[in-house]
Amino acid sequence: MSKIVKQEENFSKWYTSIIENANLVDYGLVKGTIMFKPYGFAIWKRIQEEFNKILVSLNTAEVCFPMLIPYSEFMKEKEHVEGFNPELFKVSHLGEKKLEDELVIRPTSEISFCNYFKKNIKSYNDLPCILNQWGSVFRVEKNTRPFLRTSEFLWQEQHAVFADKKEAFDFSITMVNEYKKFVNDYLSIAVLMGEKTENERFAGADNTFTIEALMPDGQVLQSATSHYLGTNFAKSYDLKYQTKNNNYDLMFQTSAGLSTRIIGAIIMSHSDNNGLVLPFKIAPIQFAIVTSNEVNKDSDELKAIYKNLFGYKYQTYFVEKSLGLQLQENEIKGIPFQLILGKKEIENNTITIYRRDTREKQNISFKEFNQNFIENLIKEYSSNLFNKTEKRLNSSIEFVNNIDEFKKALDNKKIISAYWSGNAEDEKKLKELTTATPRCFDWNQKIDKTKKCFFTNKPNAKLVYFARAY
């Protein structure tokens, strides 16, 4: 186990050292790939389990599609191709045979889902159709970091088609709201929510909605996105259905996704110089019971603990010598609560509870350790983690009027709020000048004719959030 680098000394190395010490991943054989170790994958499985409940509540059916797509199919949607072309992994040969039509290893699966919809949606009775796939996608990345930017990553991608334009658009809003709620409630991370500007929009979408989380180093992380695709893909792939009037109309389409990037957000948002800190609801081990191997495994004390922890995820560690090393290992793994049952506790008929968020110990009697106490403890833990990120986010937003104030705020690791009416070219110029990008804006916001863009001085501006981003 290597030493954990202090966050305040080198944030990037601190992040990597947390991943190494918590035993989450190893590097793969190909640049930019990672191998999930059991504990790292267990975290992703917990996220998957909990988010699946939300998908089911939205009448989403699960599917699994091939990862290979003919390049000729990819070429049908011009904006999609232009957006992804530099990032594509391609297969040019099958064995020794060179392919006339190369295969793309999916960077996303709109095209596969279009193929499904074309084959299976025949009439208005088949709509809406909402599908989800858990799998991996591939994108060529120059600068890679575990979870944050990898050439292959795991995610869920939901794709849906509707007969009604408003229903489709509203569903894309529903999905970004569900992502925000999930990240707030299950991952204890406060986020900005809004719509992407033209240049930041998903390739082929009419609208992209996003949630953005602020990290302690002042950079933001795009944490999940939802897209209203309109009829862009439907036109390219001839997605039509028979209406009640026996006409044939184009389908309206949406897509949305949450990836293993979110594990990077969890690590950076909550962890400290002592290791990983995990949100309670997605922790693979929520309670670690640490005791001596001299304690009878069928003791009344352990039975009482197990009874009160019914329904939670717990693991018991019977330690041969000092409990200290096991406690430290569990702390590095970010286990929310450790229940210590040493000689002193057994003699006094008490339990010592160690909280990962505050690093504080509390000694209570077995009588006090009941389900009501546990529920309150969990609520307090989750609220504490969320409140820290919410305070960080709210205190980091700064309004600016000009480019000098913009640069100063960036240097101070701020999220910038500013009036903007620039186009895609203006966004590129601003990024070249400052390395910052527009993150999102409130889609319900009305354009103010009296306000001018801080960068171009053009009228009809709206408030947009800017930041440096991962």
From Swiss-Prot:
Any one GO biological process: prolyl-tRNA aminoacylation
* Top-rank lineage group of the source organism: Bacteria
> Mind telling me which InterPro entries this protein's record contains?
aa-tRNA-synt_IIb (IPR002314), aa-tRNA-synth_II (IPR006195), aa-tRNA-synth_II/BPL/LPL (IPR045864), Anticodon-bd (IPR004154), Anticodon-bd_dom_sf (IPR036621), Pro-tRNA-ligase_IIa (IPR002316), Pro-tRNA-ligase_IIa_arc-type (IPR004499), Pro-tRNA_ligase_II_C (IPR016061)
- Any Pfam family matching the protein: ProRS-C_1
Query: Which of the seven top EC classes does this enzyme belong to?
Result: ligase
**Protein keywords:** Aminoacyl-tRNA synthetase, ATP-binding, Cytoplasm, Ligase, Nucleotide-binding, Protein biosynthesis
Aminoacyl-tRNA synthetase recorded as keyword: yes
Q: What does this protein do?
A: Catalyzes the attachment of proline to tRNA(Pro) in a two-step reaction: proline is first activated by ATP to form Pro-AMP and then transferred to the acceptor end of tRNA(Pro).
Q: What is the annotated quaternary arrangement, including any partners?
A: Homodimer.
Show the domain comment: Consists of three domains: the N-terminal catalytic domain, the anticodon-binding domain and the C-terminal extension.
Family recorded in the similarity comment: Belongs to the class-II aminoacyl-tRNA synthetase family. ProS type 3 subfamily.
Q: Which NCBIfam families match?
A: proS_fam_I
**Annotated protein name in UniProt:** Proline--tRNA ligase
- In the UniProt record, what gene is named as encoding this protein? proS
